[in-house]
């Protein structure tokens, strides 16, 4: 039994199923690079058969990421598995993850198949997948609600066909720790060839127990892989949180006795990137990555921490990537200093052109904001990377606004559409509403605003505002992000970024439908 816990990240596949979290190929690539930097063992990059956009994203990530195994999901049929294999061809290390439901409810109501048919399809799917790779994972969907005898029969058969990882899915978050942990243990004990595969856990958070169930699967059940997502992102109530699993196992190594190969200093930067791209704000009291995770308000706690940090801190903020809000650069800083700070932050840009564009944005910000923090730099680079990789159908130029107490604000927005400059003017119930009306008056996208969210990147009244806008059109949902010290300007940039995604072809995305 290995003493290492394999971390399988499915942010780009299962996490993307959160309503509104659909990502472009370029956004998936940026997250995949961060996951590789974090030393994630397996990255499930998508579901190749679901769309051309997802296929392309997996194929590109497979060619770019060399230090993590790249995985594609596939239903238990030849067409899906072939598609996954084709997408994974460039990978230096590839895994096909195939699945079929095994619970009576799913077999009868969803698949309309008999248990014998499901058994045969599972067996043949793994056999076919082994033609392309010796790294094959099998998941019995809704495994935690499956008949135990049937589940043992299916899993024994797929291991015999060559499945090297068996993933016990608590698909609807129905499990509780003791029962789920004992389920994994029982399967490993009853299946004669269970020693030929690594057992994995995949839990959802519908009852708020995804992390607890996963850890029980590890400690009680003997699982040696956990499937999880950054920030616990996922449909409904979310998935198992990667950061919580990793830090629980590292902090309580005395109990779990396992090693994880994750570079934990990359956890917070990756959390922030995923939050920015998806528009899902991390709650302040979220374990490990929440803004208050290492804050102490109680006088007794503060006194204890000042005397000895380990009185009230079981892990160090810097170990998971939190940095103090320190002033790092100013308007007199040069390009080399900017580039060096990017390297210190572990941030890379794909080209000199991107670096130059990011530096010009930094200089512009430094002229408007006296103090520049690491968080400002990361926001600049993140937005610049997104702009460089997205085709700008609409491009923000300038904004002016006027408001008086008791009167509707008025906004004037200048922007370019396919290179031709246009000006939109409108009133609204507030400056942001007026700005969006001004843009829509000229563009006429016919989209619906689903979400408007503002986040201060740093502290103080000079802080940059980071705005997320979520738009929907014909059931398609996209996010746009904009940053600026002027909240209304940031709002305009975010709205335009979302419009550009709506304008891009469907096959650039894994199209998410409302």
From Swiss-Prot:
Any Pfam family matching the protein: HMGL-like
Superkingdom classification of source: Bacteria
Domain Pyruvate carboxyltransferase: 5-268
Region (Regulatory domain): 395-514
Annotated binding of Mn(2+), by residue: 14, 202, 204, 239
GO molecular-function term, one example from the UniProt record: 2-isopropylmalate synthase activity
SUPFAM superfamilies on file: 2-isopropylmalate synthase LeuA, allosteric (dimerisation) domain, Aldolase
Chief place of localization: cytoplasm
GO BP annotation list: L-leucine biosynthetic process
Alphabetical keyword list: Amino-acid biosynthesis, Branched-chain amino acid biosynthesis, Cytoplasm, Leucine biosynthesis, Manganese, Metal-binding, Transferase
Pathway membership: Amino-acid biosynthesis; L-leucine biosynthesis; L-leucine from 3-methyl-2-oxobutanoate: step 1/4
EC id: 2.3.3.13
Matching CDD domains: DRE_TIM_IPMS (cd07940)
GO cellular component: cytosol
HAMAP family associated with the record: LeuA_type1
Similarity-based family: Belongs to the alpha-IPM synthase/homocitrate synthase family. LeuA type 1 subfamily.
Main function: Catalyzes the condensation of the acetyl group of acetyl-CoA with 3-methyl-2-oxobutanoate (2-ketoisovalerate) to form 3-carboxy-3-hydroxy-4-methylpentanoate (2-isopropylmalate).
Quaternary context: Homodimer.
Name of the featured protein: 2-isopropylmalate synthase
Biological source species: Burkholderia vietnamiensis (strain G4 / LMG 22486) (Burkholderia cepacia (strain R1808))
Top-level taxonomy: Bacteria, Pseudomonadati, Pseudomonadota, Betaproteobacteria, Burkholderiales
Name of the gene this protein is made from: leuA
């Amino acid at each position: 039994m290995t003493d290492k816990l394999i971390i399988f990240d499915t942010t780009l596949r299962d996490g993307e199923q959160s309503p509104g979290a659909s990502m472009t190929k370029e956004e998936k690539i940026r997250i995949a690079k961060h996951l590789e930097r974090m030393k994630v063992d397996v990255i499930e990059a998508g579901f190749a058969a679901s769309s051309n956009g997802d296929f392309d994203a997996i194929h590109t990530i497979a060619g770019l990421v060399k230090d993590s195994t790249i995985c594609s999901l596939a239903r238990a049929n030849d067409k899906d598995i072939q598609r996954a294999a084709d997408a994974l061809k460039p990978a230096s290390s590839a895994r096909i993850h195939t699945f079929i439901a095994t619970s009576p409810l799913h077999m009868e109501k969803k698949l309309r198949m008999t248990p014998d048919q499901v058994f045969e399809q599972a067996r043949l799917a793994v056999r076919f997948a082994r033609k392309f790779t010796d790294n094959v994972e099998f998941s019995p969907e809704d495994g935690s609600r499956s008949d135990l005898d049937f589940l043992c029969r299916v899993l024994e058969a797929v291991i015999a066909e060559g499945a090297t990882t068996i993933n016990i899915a608590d698909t609807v978050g129905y499990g509780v720790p003791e029962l789920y942990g004992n389920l994994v243990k029982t399967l490993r004990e009853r299946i004669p060839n269970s020693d030929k595969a690594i057992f994995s856990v995949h839990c959802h958070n519908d009852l708020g127990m995804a992390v607890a169930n996963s850890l029980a699967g590890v400690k009680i059940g003997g699982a040696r892989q956990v499937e999880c997502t950054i920030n616990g992102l996922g449909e409904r109530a979310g998935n198992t949180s990667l950061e919580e699993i990793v830090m629980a196992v590292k902090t309580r190594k005395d109990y779990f006795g396992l090693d994880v190969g994750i570079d934990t200093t990359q956890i917070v930067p990756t959390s922030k990137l995923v939050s920015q791209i998806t528009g899902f704000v991390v709650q302040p009291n979220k374990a490990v990555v929440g803004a208050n995770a290492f804050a102490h308000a109680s006088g007794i706690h503060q006194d204890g921490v000042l005397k000895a940090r380990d009185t009230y801190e079981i892990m160090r903020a810097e170990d998971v990537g939190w940095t103090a809000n320190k002033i790092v650069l100013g308007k007199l800083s040069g390009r080399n200093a900017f580039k060096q700070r990017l390297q210190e932050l572990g941030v890379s840009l794909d080209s000199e052109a991107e670096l130059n564009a990011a530096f010009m944005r930094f200089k512009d910000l430094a002229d408007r904001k006296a103090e520049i923090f690491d968080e400002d730099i990361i926001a600049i680079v993140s937005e610049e990377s997104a702009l460089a990789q997205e085709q700008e159908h609409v491009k923000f130029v300038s904004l002016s606004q006027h408001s008086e107490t008791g009167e509707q604000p008025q906004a004037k927005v200048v922007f370019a559409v396919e290179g031709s400059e246009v000006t939109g003017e409108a009133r609204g119930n507030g400056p942001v509403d007026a700005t969006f009306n001004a843009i829509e008056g000229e563009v006429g996208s016919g989209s619906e605003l689903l979400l408007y969210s503002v986040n201060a990147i740093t502290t103080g009244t000079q802080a940059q505002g980071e705005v997320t806008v979520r738009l929907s059109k014909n059931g398609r949902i996209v996010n746009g992000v904009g940053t600026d010290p002027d909240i209304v300007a940031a709002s305009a940039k975010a709205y335009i970024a979302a419009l550009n995604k709506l304008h891009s072809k469907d096959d650039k995305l894994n199209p998410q439908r409302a």
